[in-house]
Structure formats: C-alpha cells, structure tokens
From Swiss-Prot:
It comes from Mycoplasma mobile (strain ATCC 43663 / 163K / NCTC 11711). Its EC number is 2.7.1.33. A monovalent cation. Ammonium or potassium. This is Type III pantothenate kinase. Its cofactor is NH4(+); K(+). It catalyses: (R)-pantothenate + ATP = (R)-4'-phosphopantothenate + ADP + H(+). It is found in: Cytoplasm.
Amino acid sequence: MNLYLDIGNTNLKFGYEIENQFHFYTLPTLENYTCDMLSKNLESFIKKQKFNYLIVSSVVPSLNLVIKDFASIHLKSKVMFIDKIKKEILNLNGREHSSIGSDIIANALYVSSRYEDAIVISLGTATVIFHVVSKRLEGAIIAPGVKNSYLSLIQSAKKLSEVILKLPRKNLGGNTQEAISLGILKGNFHLINGFINELDPKGKSKILITGGNYGMLKDVLKDYEYVDNMVILGLKDYYEIFK
C-alpha cells in the first residue's frame, strides 16, 4: 500500500487506498513543519498502516526535504516525487517537467489516460485551467483563486466587510452582499466559461472540475463533472507508470 501526498500552497492533502476506497486527511500548509510534527499530526490518520512508498506532488519546494525525512524516519518507506515523465504517456509539448507545476502534471496524467480531449478547471489557491488533447498538454492558464480574490477584495477595500457569498437570482445586486456575491461567484463563472469557449469553441472537449474551492462555485458550474482529489488519483497513476 502507498501513501499519496498533494502539497499545495494552502493545504497538504494525504490519501491512501484500502479495498478500492480512498481515505483522506488534510493539514494546513506550514513552512515550519518538522518530520516529528507531521508524524504527530498524522498519528490518528495513519495509525499502524505500513506504506511501501510515499508518492508526492509538491508546489512548495521548501517542504520537500522534510517530507523525505518524514518518509524515511517515520513511515520507513521510500519516497517518489513527480520528477520525470514519459512522452508517450503525457507529451509536455517540448517543455521541461520542472517548468510545470507537479499538480498540473498529476491532474494531466489522470486526464490523459481517460479522455482523448479534456479541459480541466482546478479551483485551488489559484484557478488553473489546462487542456489535454491526445495525451498532449497543450498549455495552461493561471488566474487568482476564487477564495483569494474574495479575501483580497475585502482586505483592500476599507468599507467592505466579510459577507456570506450567495448568488442572487438577478443580474445586479441590490445591496453590498448581493453585489459582492455576483462579482466573485458569477465573475469567476464568466472567467472560466470564457476561457472554455476560447479553448473549445465547438464544444467537443470533456470539461472536468476539481479543487478545494469547488464548493464556492458548484451552483454555477453544475453542468460540468466534478472529480474529487484529482491530484491524488493522478499520483496513483504516476506510481503505476514508474514503479
């Protein structure tokens, strides 16, 4: 059995699979983690499970050494980072894998083995949109994340206070809460749909949504398929390729 880890800018997401059922645990991303701290925080999740490998996608390089030590000292397992890719499995269009976020590569691996033509919208710290056609990663778009856009607005505008985001059934807000909800929720909906229409004007691509901020936009993105923890699933695919 393996342990999978998605190191994002906001959260660390751990997952392992028993009898085709994934179990997940989330910790906040902190740069002062030690391997002992991780072990203590994960004690109730890991219990007495034995792992052969810790498979990692990381966009926070400063944590990589700690993760290696954690795997070696506490898990007694080998560690595998996304550090190579086979062109026949996922064509990066001439780019080095190091120039592309490993979370994007993990998601693209998941997609490339299941769909001929797919657009993925990953709603995390950033909103990332990328297109995979015939196992080729065409490229990506990175925009401010939904939650960060909202928090940035509230923090930078002195007269605005935090509100509950709820989409009104009209095109113009009648008060500050409605106006902010429209700007953040419908604004991100139009941003996403605008890029989808540019990338896939004929509507032939499979559209997939993933990421922790999906809950904020699920009411406006309900026409698209949601895949929970796509990075973890992509890490499982990565292990199967390179084990």
